[in-house]
Amino acid sequence: MKRIFSCSSTQVAVERWNRHDQKLLEAVHRGDVGRVAALASRKSARPTKLDSNGQSPFHLAASKGLTECLTILLANGADINSKNEDGSTALHLATISCQPQCVKVLLQHGANEDAVDAENRSPLHWAASSGCASSVLLLCDHEAFLDVLDNDGRTPLMIASLGGHAAICSQLLQRGARVNVTDKNDKSALILACEKGSAEVAELLLSHGADAGAVDSTGHDALHYALHTQDKALWRHLQQALSRRRRGGQRLVQHPDLASQASPSEPQAGSPPKSSWRAEPEEEQEEKEDEDPCSEEWRWKYEEERRKVVRLEQELVQKTEECKTQAAAYLDLENQIREQAQELGVLLSWEPRASGKQGSSLRPGGDGMEQGCPKDLLAESTQELKKQQQAAATVNPVLAPKKAEDSAPGKIQYEVHGRSQPEEQGPPQSPASETIRKATGQQLTTNGAQTFGPDHADQLPAGQKESSQVLGVEPGGTVAEPVGPAAMNQLLLQLREELAAVWREKDAARGALSRPVMEGALGTPRAEAAAAAWEKMEARLERVLARLEWAKAGLQVKPEVPSQESREGALKAAPGSIKQDEEKEKRVPGAQGEPLGALGGEKALGGLAKGQLEKEMSVLRLSNSNLLEELGELGRERQRLQRELQSLSQRLQREFVPKPQAQVQLQQLRQSVGLLTNELAMEKEATEKLRKLLASQSSGLRGLWDCLPADLVGERSAQSKAAESLEELRACISTLVDRHREAQQVLARLQEENQQLRGSLSPCREPGTSLKAPASPQVAALEQDLGKLEEELRAVQATMSGKSQEIGKLKQLLYQATEEVAELRAREAASLRQHEKTRGSLVAQAQAWGQELKALLEKYNTACREVGRLREAVAEERRRSGDLAAQAAEQERQASEMRGRSEQFEKTAELLKEKMEHLIGACRDKEAKIKELLKKLEQLSEEVLAIRGENARLALQLQDSQKNHEEIISTYRNHLLNAARGYMEHEVYNILLQILSMEEE
């Protein structure tokens, strides 16, 4: 079994698959370590040789995780970095199949951890794709490159995010992997994680600085892909990240996909919320309610406008630099044109000066060089050189000069197009011009009369007709015919390269303008002016390209007519004839003052070529002036943009940017509001404590009311049963005090009466009466009656002694009266004892009431003091409440003003958005035009490559012709010197005669 690759006509056996290789592959497939060791030690089988399926024993062992077999094969000389058909190494296969032990063995034996397969994926890509965290850790420990891009432009971190492998993402981020890299579709790792629906990976990426607002090529951000999943945790993480981003200065608008996900009436179960504002956690919403929403919104808008200004300033600086670069390029171009014109003037100025000694009849308008018009001289000399060199090449091909490269046509082409000569043509021309000048100088010192230039035919004195016939022939340039188009092609190549550079700069500017970061700035007047300027520049570049194409076509057609005529003249020329020599002598240019080379029908052709050159020169000068005008317009456009930016900055500072004093005042107001809020909370706490104390005191007062006597309570309830005011309490207490005083007075009177009674009863007790208690007034009255009765009895006994019955009755009455008196005295004693008891109880009760009254007075005084403090606190709280109400009204007024300004800002934002959409549409149209122009540019680049090859070939021919030209000049100079001295070889003389004869024909 063998495999042969045929890459040529002969088939060569590249790899021969023998039976030993097959046995080794089968042993590895079975995992037979002993068999693998035996076969590998024989050296008859190669472990890395591929079979017909593109697999080898070494790669199979790595993919199956056979660590022992892998170690044996490595010990027997297996190439550790060999690749299979897919370009995968053993390390790739081990990471694909998630074999960390094999990965460890391969890395220890020196496997290349940064090798890439056909998909440009490294082992770290496949380890991240398979979710093998151990392999990722091993590769990171061996310093594998973390941010390598595969064919899809994805890094290992992006692949791990797409697979939802949070552990691998954590390892890569800890090792320093870049989190905001995007693939070919402009999708970042966060967008891929949201597309997968992995909330854990998204949270990890956001914690490491992932940009939640980045969008892909379709214009969708991470939240758009998260809304297609049902993971609310993922929504919450993204919305919190966007909220933090909005707080940092970028305003968060309502996401367009949220409205489509939620129903217009009320959201369904499991559907995302209607807006990113409502989807935030409740805790975050409560925090936002505590904050001032108007001031926060104003601050966000201010930060957004400030960032727009910064972006506009950066863009203006960039455009200014581009304008400066273009201005410098145009200035260099103008300087090069002037230098080329000066060089042409230096090269051609010697001819009118030399011919001026014989008068101005030699060349009419010979001082045109001093007037800045060398094109007439250049056109005539070009035609003469072409014709004369063709004639010389027909007579003697060996001595045919090829020196047109250092003549004026090459330079006039570059002067016409405003470009300097290529570097490969510059050095050979300088020695040629020096040689010409040396030859001219020798002729001046020898003859003392005329200067003969190799590039132009000059006149001779009348006495030297033969010399004038010899010297009247100037070497022509056969190479001049292809040099003109070649030079023009080289010029077109350079101009196209410059045009390509301009297009690249324009594309870069377009890309910068079309990026989402610049969307906010597209609606400004400055962006509209910049777009209009770019449109003008695009139209001008198209016109310049059309002119260059026209010039190229005209210059490719122009040289064909004179060259064809020259070739026809050369074919008609016969070898030397005496008659032709005589005709040539008659037509000596010095006698008639007409330029050389204007012979016969060729004079009209020379005039035609001259007219074409003049027309092309005028057209190209016009294009040069147009370019200069465009440069001036660009400068004016730059100044106008600077003025607009300054006005925009002033407007933003005037309308959107708050003054420093207002900002400081706003900060102070916020601090004062915070302090007032804290004080209000403290006052609320103090008020609550006072309320509790007042309630306790009210309960104490109610207890006092309950302790008051029933008659006082009845009077209070009768007056105002529901009112328990302090005045009523004071009245009751004063009444109670008065009653207490009256009771004390009554008690004092009773005590006095008691003392009087005791004093009155003490004399009655002395005669032996057994009465212990003092007699009452009735008893005294009875005693008086008894005394009277006794007196009457004595009187009656005295008067009526005889009436015993009446006396017995009277005694009985007396006894009865005595019993009644005793009975009355007993009753009086009992009443006295009861009175003493009552008096003691009244005294004890009065003492208790006195103590209670003292306690009540103390409580009353304390309550009065507390009530005073409460009244002061209530008054202070009312005053502070009034201040807070005034501040709240002021803040409400400011909030209403800010709301009005925010509405104006929203209207302005809507207008800017409309302008932005309009500009985006215009940019899309321009991008389509740019694509078409790029296609044309590709076609032109192909032509440029062809022209470049032709130019290289012509450069080689130019070098050969210059060498021949130098030899011809040296030989020709010697012959001229010999002719001037009066002797010449016969062969040379014959050759010159032949040349003159051909010139006449």
Swiss-Prot record:
Entry-linked SMART domains: ANK
GO molecular function: actin binding
Record's compositionally biased regions (Basic and acidic residues): 402-422, 579-588, 890-902
Gene: ANKRD35
SUPFAM superfamilies xref list: Ankyrin repeat
Annotated disulfide bonds: none
Keyword Repeat: yes
PROSITE patterns for this protein: ANK_REP_REGION (PS50297), ANK_REPEAT (PS50088)
Stretches forming ANK repeats: 53-82, 86-115, 119-148, 152-181, 185-214, 218-247
Chain residue ranges for the region called Disordered: 256-296, 352-482, 559-601, 879-902
Gene3D superfamilies attached to this UniProt entry: 1.10.287.1490, Ankyrin repeat-containing domain
PANTHER family listed in its UniProt record: ANKYCORBIN, DUF3447 DOMAIN-CONTAINING PROTEIN
Residue ranges with Polar residues bias: 440-450
Coiled coil region boundaries: 295-344, 610-696, 733-810, 851-968
InterPro entries reported in the protein's UniProt record: Ankyrin_rpt, Ankyrin_rpt-contain_sf, RAI14/UACA
Pfam families for this protein: Ank_2
Protein name: Ankyrin repeat domain-containing protein 35
Keyword list, A-Z: ANK repeat, Coiled coil, Repeat
Composition skew (Acidic residues), residue ranges: 281-295
Chain intervals with Low complexity compositional bias: 423-434
Species of provenance: Homo sapiens
